[in-house]
Amino acid sequence: MSKPEVENLFSLCDSESKGYLTMEDLRKVCPQLDDNDLRFIFTELDQDGSGKIEKLEFLRGFQDTVQHGESHGLNGMQRRASVAVEDPPMFLRDEQMFDSESDSTSSRPAIRVFDEEHYHSESDTNINIDFSVPCQEEVLVLYEQLQSSGVPALLRKFERVVGSFHKELSEKKHENERLQRIYASEREMYNRRMEEMESEVDQQLELTEMKARQEERDRLTKEKEEMRQRMSDEMSEMRNNIERLQKMEKALERENERLNHQKELSDKLKVVNEENNDLRQNLAENHLELAMIKSELAQVRCEFDQKQDELSARRDQASHATEESESVRKQLQLLFDANRKLHETNESLRDALDSRASVLRQFNLRTPSPGLLSSNRNSVENFQTSTNVFRSVPLHAISTEEQVPETSLILDDAHSLQGLDTPGDLMGLNDANGPAERTFRIVMCGDAAVGKSSFVMRVIRRQFTNQLPSTLGVDFHVKTVNVDGRNVALQLWDTAGQERFRSLCKSYFRRADGAILVYDVCAEQSFLRVRDWIETIKESTERSIPIILVGNKVDMRISTPGSVAKTDGASMAAAMGVLFMETSALDGSNIDNAMLALTRELMAVEDVEIRSTGVVLNPAVAKKGGCFSKCRGS
């Protein structure tokens, strides 16, 4: 028996398509078999004893049973008898028909005779079998295979199953025909009933439609009448309203004309009153100006008398001025000669700096200090800067020695620097007592809200200004002070601390002579950015400029936890090579000291630059008289 045929047999038995067979499935398929036969078949096919027959178990067990019977030359009934020996029925087990010691060959004839008799007794009852089923060919093939398999019991049971199945199919066929006849009669009756209902519904719809149309006509007619009446009432009301509005408009026009006339009169009256007040005020001012003119006229008369007295004195001074102008011309000529000599000596200085030993042997000079050597080396690079300094220094303060050799004029810096800023000459920071001899450009820089503008106001006005607006761009201030007996003009450039103005600040750093870097001792973030500010200043300037680091708002240090300590600021200044001081713009502490320290540093740097180019500043104070001093002061 082939595998597809066995699979077809399994699918016929598995009507619910579960994939396995149970005892109940076999009982439904083979209702003619008793429980012993079903148990025998189920035990044969359930090889793993799981209580259900899988598809693979069914295929393998069925084919193995058929092949085993064919290989031993036994038919189906003989194989069943051989299996029954291993597991005999209850009535055979009770009678103990076979002896366990007997030979298997002696027992086989008895079993075969018993089964053959049982086969013939059951096959006689199923002589007439009808195989007219829907799958007749498959059933016939299966029937032939069962006949050839030599299992009469299965053949008889198969015949019974096919017979019962055919009988049930016949009954179902008759039942189906009966149901079809009933369905046809019911359908015909239903169609007649539906036709009657459709006719009734059509009649009802026609009546309802006619009634609705009539009601709609009546309603529309009534609404038209109501709308016509309402429109006539509204038209009459609108005519009345128009008449009232026209009357009110005329009344308003008359009222507006009257009000406009009154307004014109009031405006004219106001203009006249204002003109009258202006005339009175002008009259009072004229009286006041007249009195002031009279007093000024008297003062002018007094001044005229004084000027006449001074004129005679100035005539005497004119001769002195002529002599002084002649001396100035001589000094200018000397300066021109000195400048020419400086140009000539700059070339020799470059060679001298490269061969320091030869210069020292030539002039028998002692070894200069590192600071002086660096200043002399920078003098060559900053010659153009030094020539500009000549213009800012008063002419009477510049002296040249005609009898001194050129080399002694240039290399006299060591001796002149020894006398610079001696303790006896330091006089502090005071108000200026004359015109400025020097001018320094100082840039105020630092983060926003650290007190730069308050610092500047304390320097300029000597007072603290509260609630200053934020600086936008740059604010310029000028303060002339007297430092150690010299009048110095300090140009303070107050720059904005916001990040967006940083590029603008860099352009002012390039032209600055010094810088005041301010941080807030109560704001650690502003202190942390000090290093960046110093690097920005050094990158923006072409030469090294004096810088002072100022820690502002020390008056708030006690009330603010986590403020920057003074030692931290001093350490930062020492590491960056700048000056350091803590101040308070509120009470003015150390403001003047900070400005004094920076100004002295600026003056010292400028003195070194000037001396390195061969020009010596004369500390003598200018004479009070003279045309040149007056022109310089103006």
Curated annotation (Swiss-Prot):
Disruption of the gene: reported phenotype: RNAi-mediated knockdown results in defective uterine seam (utse) cell nuclear migration, defective utse cell outgrowth and irregular uterine lumen formation.
Pro-peptide region(s)? 632-634
Q: Which residues form a coiled coil?
A: 169-310
List, alphabetically, the Pfam families matched.
EF-hand_7 (PF13499), Ras (PF00071)
**GO terms of biological process kind:** vesicle-mediated transport
Q: Any idea where the EF-hand domain is?
A: 5-33, 33-68
CDD domains, sorted? Rab (cd00154)
Decide whether keyword Metal-binding is in the record.
Answer: yes
GO molecular function per UniProt: calcium ion binding; GTP binding; GTPase activity
* SUPFAM superfamilies reported for this sequence: EF-hand (SSF47473), P-loop containing nucleoside triphosphate hydrolases (SSF52540)
Keyword check for Ribosomal protein, yes or no.
Answer: no
Q: How does it assemble?
A: Homodimer.
What this protein is called in its record is: Ras and EF-hand domain-containing protein homolog
Query: Source species, please?
Result: Caenorhabditis elegans
> Lineage of the native species?
Eukaryota, Metazoa, Ecdysozoa, Nematoda, Chromadorea
The gene for this chain is rsef-1
